[in-house]
Amino acid sequence: MSLGLLESQLRLKVFGRLQVIRQHLRMTNHTVKDGECLLTKAGCAGVITLNRPKALNALNLGMIRLIYPQLGLWEEDPETYLVIIKGVGGKAFCAGGDIRAVTDAGKAGDRLAQDFFREEYILNNAIGTYKKPYVALIDGITMGGGVGLSVHGHFRVASENTLFAMPETAIGLFPDVGGGYFLPRLPGKLGLYLALTGFRLKGSDVQKAGIATHFVESEKIPSLEQDLVAMKCPSKENVADVLDSYHNKSYAAQDKPFVLAEHLDKINSLFSASSVEAIIENLRCDGSSFALKQLQTLSTMSPTSLKITFRQLKEGSSMSLQEVLTMEYRLSQACMKGYDFYEGVRAVLIDKNQNAKWNPELLEEVTDDYIDSYFTSLGNSDLKL
C-alpha cells in the first residue's frame, strides 16, 4: 500500500469519526436525562412513566425519542397486550411540551423548532393508530403535549386531580397535537369554545366533556393499574371491562352536573358563527354575564391565534388525524417564523406579567391572506406520516 493511499484512508477514518462525534453531540443536545422517562414491562403491559415532576412532567424531544420506538417494539411484542402511560409527582400527568426549549430554538434558528413538532406529531399519530389497548392515566394537570400523549389513545382515565386545558391562544400558538381533530368532534361547539378561550376543565368534567373515557378516584388508580397489568392475555374488551368497573364505582363524581351544563345552549348558539368576528358580535349582542366574561377572555388572546384556531377546527372537522397533523405542522412552523408566539411566551411564561402586545393587535387587522399563509404547504418539508 502506498504512503499516499494510507494517508488518504487515515484521513477518511478521522473524518468519519468526527462526523460520528458531531452527530452524537447534536443528538445529545436534546436527549433525555437519566430517568426523565421510564419504560418498563409489568405483567402483560408496557408502562411509560413520565418522570420530570419538577417540570410537571413536561415533554421534551429526548422523551419523545424514547417513547416512539418503544411503542413500536411493544406493538410487535406478542407478550405485551396493552400500554399504560402515567406521570409521577402527584401534580401532573404532563403539563405540556417543553415550550421554553422550543422558544429558544426558534429564536436561534435551531432545528429543534422543526424536530420537536415533527416528532411529537409523529408520536401523536402512532398513539392514534395503535393496534393494542393504550391507557392514559391522566391523574393531574393535562395540557398541550400531555393531551397529545393521551387523547388519541383508546382509554383516558381522569381523576379528581385532572386539570385539562388547551391554552395555546394565550401564547400566540394554537391547540395542536391533533387538537384540530378531537376538539371539533366534541359535542356541539364545546371543542371550539375550549380551543378559543382555553377554558379549564377539572375532575369528572373532563370525562363528561368526552375528553376522558373514564373517571376513577385518584386513590384507586394504583389498584386499577395493578388489575390491568395482572390480566392474562387481555383483549381490548377485557381492558374496557376493568376500566368500566372502576368507573361505575365512582358514583359521587357522576352525580355532579357538568360544569358548563347551564351554558351549553349559549355556547352552541353563540359559537356557531361563521367567523371569530361574528362570534365576538354574538357575545356582545347577547350581553349576559357569561357572554361578557367570554368577551373579556378572548380580548386577551392573540388575534392571529384565534383566527388560525377557528379555521384549524373548521377544516379539521372533516379531516383524518393524519391530515390534521400535517396541517398543524404547517401551522407550527409558521408560528415559529412569526411574532406572537415569542411575545406570548414572554408575557405568560417568562415575565409572567400577562401583558402581551400582539401584532397584529386587532382581529380586523388579521387578513384572510395572512391566515392563508399559515396553512400553505411546506412542499418537501411537509410532515410525512
Curated annotation (Swiss-Prot):
A single GO BP: valine catabolic process
Protein name: 3-hydroxyisobutyryl-CoA hydrolase, mitochondrial
GO molecular function terms noted in the UniProt entry: 3-hydroxyisobutyryl-CoA hydrolase activity
Gene transcribed to yield this protein: hibch
Binding, substrate: 120, 145, 168, 176
Reactions mediated catalytically: 3-hydroxy-2-methylpropanoyl-CoA + H2O = 3-hydroxy-2-methylpropanoate + CoA + H(+)
Organism: Xenopus tropicalis
Family per record: Belongs to the enoyl-CoA hydratase/isomerase family.
Enzyme class: hydrolase
E.C. no: 3.1.2.4
Pathway: Amino-acid degradation; L-valine degradation
Biological role: Hydrolyzes 3-hydroxyisobutyryl-CoA (HIBYL-CoA), a saline catabolite. Has high activity toward isobutyryl-CoA. Could be an isobutyryl-CoA dehydrogenase that functions in valine catabolism. Also hydrolyzes 3-hydroxypropanoyl-CoA.
Protein location: Mitochondrion
Lineage: Eukaryota, Metazoa, Chordata, Craniata, Vertebrata
Gene3D superfamilies tied to this protein: 2-enoyl-CoA Hydratase, Chain A, domain 1 (3.90.226.10)
Domain of life the protein comes from: Eukaryota
Keywords, in A-Z order: Branched-chain amino acid catabolism, Hydrolase, Mitochondrion, Transit peptide
GO CC term (a single one): mitochondrion
InterPro entries, per the entry: ClpP/crotonase-like_dom_sf, ECH_dom, HIBYL-CoA-H
Major site of localization recorded for this protein: mitochondrion
